[in-house]
Amino acid sequence: ICTEPYSDTSLSKEFSLFPFPLSDFQKYSIEAINSGNHILVTAHTGSGKTVCAEYAILHYVSLGKKVIYTSPIKALSNQKFCDLKKKFPDISFGILTGDITDNPTADVLIMTTEILRNRLKREKFDSSDTVTSKFTLDIENDLGCVIFDEVHYFSDKHRGVVWEETLMFLPSTIALVMLSASINNPETFAKWIEDRYKDNREKDVYLASTNHRIVPLTHYGYMCIGKGELAYMKEKHKSDYEKYHNNLDKFLLLKNDDFSFNLNNVKIIKDIKSHIYKSKIHVNQSFAINTLINKLKEENMLPAIFFILSRKNIEKYAFMIEQNMYEDDSTTSFTIEKKCESILRNGIANYKEFLMLPEYQSMITLLKKGIAIHHAGILPILREMVEILLSEGLLKVLLCSETFAVGLNMPVKTTVLTSLSKFDGSGDRQLYSSEYLQMAGRAGRRGHDIVGHVIHMNNLFEMPENHEYNLLMNGKPQTLCSKYHMSFDSIMLNNSKSTTNIDELTSLSGNSFATVAIQSNITRMCDDINRLTLEHGSLIKPTKYDDNVMTEYNEYIKLMASVSQNKRNKMVKQLQKKKDNIVDLDNCLKYQDKNKKFDEEISLLEENINLQKNTFSDQIANYVDMLIEYGFIEDSKLTMLGDIALLIQEVPNIVMSKLLVMCDNFKDLSTVDLIMLFSVYNNTRLLDDKFTIPDRLNFKLTDTLRTLDALHISVTNQALERQIVAFDGEINYNMLCIEEWLDVTTSDEAIQFLHKIKCEYGLSLGDFSKAAMKIINIGLEMTNVAIKIHDVELEHKLSTIGSLIEKFVVTNQSLYVT
């Protein structure tokens, strides 16, 4: 644990590789990397964690070793690839994101964590598999280091298991550079990393943390009302006017960099909001946004990022902004359209098709005022264009979703929060402190700003309770917790090399971070048993207490309760005799009751300890039972159905492989039918989501979809009964419009189609493109299946999916990968 000021001068040469003085945590990181150990860096956004990754690349490439850089999202992978290529022109870089593959034999490979996990998992269980491998690197011998950017994704509800399995499966010889936002339990996590290999521990983990920001943050609240409303307040509520008007259209300090929380200013803001509500004063969103933006411009607090946690409001708010954000003498308004065209022309061959898009023209309208938008519903190419403009200092105001805060190195002078709550898939909730700090941390540019500003647009959201507001800005960082669970894939991969070995799988699961929590629970429960046993032993038994007599007495009481009233009356006298025969009955009953409670508590704890110990073996047995029931394992060996399933990752493989066999290798389906079939596993959302099969489809496709639906429900229900995880996601028919896209042949037709799905269905161009690329990836996986089962007809039908879908602006291109 690196807490002392760094004083060693032996690495001065290494430190001098960077043109600025290094912080202590950066120096410790370089020492760890130089000595071949692991490093876990936990620090706020903007603290300089990138230095650690860059040194690791320089160091291990100089040793002739390969480096893998993993990131949580494709957009971050693409940007890192571009940035690192520019920074280190003498080092070769490659990228693998599922959609894009470029230079897979490079010195440094940048990839999503899923791709590395899938490769490691298959290598762990089946070293003979070459069909599905995305890259041919000899991990055991040639890989020197893996850099995990944003390693706090380890706790992500849906994807955390990917990070955990990747860390579990990496060989002990490979150094880890783990970069994370501040976390609450770094020591526990670091110890788990060290102990993964038990007796084969080869490396220590350096834990280097910092709470220091190079550019400190100051957090403000902000309220405004119109001049007319202010005049009304002055006339009708003079005392309130005197009290509040000096705090309107002002930045009221909420928190300094020293973690202090200004309760007085919070109270002022709440009082103003209360007065506005009681006086029925209406402050519309457009007025609030324009007033704040004018203030930011006047106070020289641009560029600014507005985080808007509802995608539909991003464009709405952007077009509310009335004034040009550029300085009066700036020529950027007149040149930015040509700049955008140049960015696209230099990045992609079909740039003219993007220039024709209404979305592009709409974006240009905003850009001419220094304003841009950024969210997942926008085409990746256009999002990247915005990122490039921001990185070159050509934008003044960016309105974006929370995703922009994840990793993308785009600091600004000011960040603005338009809400403190978000929809998380199941309902609205307040932001976690870690989420808030990730967004707030984008404020403050190293080398440009003395302080970064964080503004809360209190006009636009309900204020939290005071203690919640304080915790949001000053709360503990997130605690890393395991999301590990066994999976169908792990069981099948284990069976692909041998017969089912539950002990081996249980041992593998025992290396997970989940085991740390399980062992902690067991230790706590054992301590509770010891405490209860001591307390139990200290109970004072009444002198004349007799177990047999008391048991007989209690049974007689139970018997009386079960008989008729008439019989019960006759038994009362007998009961009284029994009472008279027991000396000190009240104390005997109290002792017996306490004794029973101790026994029950200890028994329950012992039962729970047993359940904890058998967590994984029970889970594994349930997975194996399901795989046997559905025909993936037979006689403890993987069947052909299991072999097929292992080639599928993009969709629930248990369902799709079973469907393939049940529907005779899809022999009755055309290529278009297959595209429609693959389209039902998507994450798109429409104005009116479609969860039922449309009537317009042909009989063969409809019949296949019904079979798929029934199979999906069956597998889901069976998994729920066994309390195991089957898969995420649900079937929907939101992307069946893809059929119409297949007939598009001209740019005009493409624009008409894309306009139609946006206006009629609420399906954005970015979402449509992402879902379309997924269908192509499913087709590629199913092609591997067709090759595996020697089905030439199916392989032929699948071979044209890519060319039918990938056209016009619906592509996997990236401006960062050219």
Each language-model region and where it sits:
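Conserved two-lobed SF2 helicase motor
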Residues: T105-K121, K369-R383, L389-N409
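Conserved Walker B
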Residues: E150-H152, L395, F404, L420, ...
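Non-catalytic terminal extensions of ATP-dependent helicases
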Residues: K368, A372, G377, I388-L395, ...
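Conserved C-terminal RecA-like helicase domain
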Residues: Y69-T70, N78, K85-T97, N284, ...
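Helicase-associated low-complexity/disordered flanking segments
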Residues: I1-I39, P216, N246, Q323, ...
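Conserved P-loop/Walker A NTP-binding site and adjacent catalytic elements of P-loop NTPases
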Residues: F20-I214, Y222-M223, A304-I308, K316-Y326
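Conserved segment of the helicase C-terminal RecA-like domain
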Residues: M410, T414-D424, R429-Y469
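Conserved interdomain linker/interface between the two RecA-like ATPase lobes of SF2 helicase motors
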Residues: M168, A175-V177, S182-M320, A372
